Amino acid sequence: MRRSTFKKIGKRVLQIGLPVVILALFLNQVKNNWSQLTAHTFQWNPWLLGLAFFGFMLQEVSYGLIWQNILARLGARLGLRICLRIYLASEFVRYIPGNVWHILTRILWVGKYGVSRPVAFASMTIELITKLAAGMLVFSASLLFWRDFGAIGSLLNGPLVDILGSASIFALLVILHPRVLNGLLNLVLRLLKRNPVQLAVRYSDILLVTLAWCASWLVAGCAFYVLLLALWPGAPLVALPICIGIYALAWDIGFVSFITPSGLGFREAAIVGLFALALPLPVGLATVIALLSRFVSTIAEVICVSIAYLSGGKQVRSIQQGSQTHMPGEPDLEAPGSGAVPVKLPVSVPVEGGTVGE
C-alpha cells in the first residue's frame, strides 16, 4: 500500500517537476542568447500564419476520418459526421485531470451506436500504433533529404544517410506485420504484467491505415513548414520534407514521454534538437518555431474540439458520468464484425501523460 502511494506521489512529482525543469532550462537558454535573439529581425506574415493554422485544423479533422476507416475495417460502420463528433468531442475531456477520460468517453459513446467495447478498444489500439509508426516512417523518409544540410550532413556522407533512412522504413514495415506486431505488443504487455491483446486485422489493413496517417502527417508537416516560412521567408524548399519529418518524430517523442500532458516540453525540445541536427536556422528561430507550432496547433485543436463538443455536449457529460462506473478492461469479450477473434483487453492503455487503469 505504501509502495503504491510512493509510486503515485513520485509520478505526480515528475509530472509537475519535469515541465518546470524544462521551462527553467528554456528560460536560461533564452537569457544566454537574448542579445542574438533581439538582433534577429523576425518577419511575421499573417497570411502564412493563417494558412498554417488551417493546415493544423485539417489534421484535426483527419483524425476522425482515419478512426472511421479503422472501425470499418473492424466491421463497425459509422457515418463520418458521427465519427468526427465522437472523436473530437471526446478529446475535450482530455484536459480534465487524469488524462484518461477521452479514452473512456469515446469507448462508451461509440457503444451507443452499437459498437462493442472490444472493437472500440481495438480501434484505438490500432490507431495509436499506426499513428506512431506513420510518424517514424515519415521521419525515416525525410532522412533522404538530410544529407544537404546540418550537422548530420557534415558528419555522414550521402549514402550512409540514405541507407539509414531506407533501413528504418524497411524495419518499420516488418514490425507492422500482424504476427510481428502482436508478438511485440504482447511482449510489452507481459513485461507490464497486463493481459494480452490480439489484433485480428490483415497486414493490408494496417498498411492502408498507416498510409492514411502518413497523409495526415504530410498535412501537419506542410503547415509546420508554412509556419517557418511565415517567420523566415528565406527557408529553402528542400526544408519542406525535413520539416515534415521533424514535426512527425517530435510528436512521437512527446507522446511516448508519458509524463507531461500532450508531451509538453518534450515535443518542443525534440523540434529544437532535430533542427540543430538537420537544418541550420537563425539563432533562436528553432525555439520560437517550436513554441509557436505548439500554440497554433493547440488553438486549432481547441476550436475543432469545442465545435464538436457543443454539438454533442449533453452526450459527452452523461457519458463522462457513466464512465466513472464503467472502466475498460473486461477480458474475453467477443468482438463482432468481419470474423474478428475474441479480444482480451489489457488492464491499462497508454495515453499521453500516463495509462488508463493505473
Regions found by a protein language model. Name each.
Residues 92-97, 111, 121-140, 253, ...:
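Membrane-embedded alpha-helical segments of transport systems
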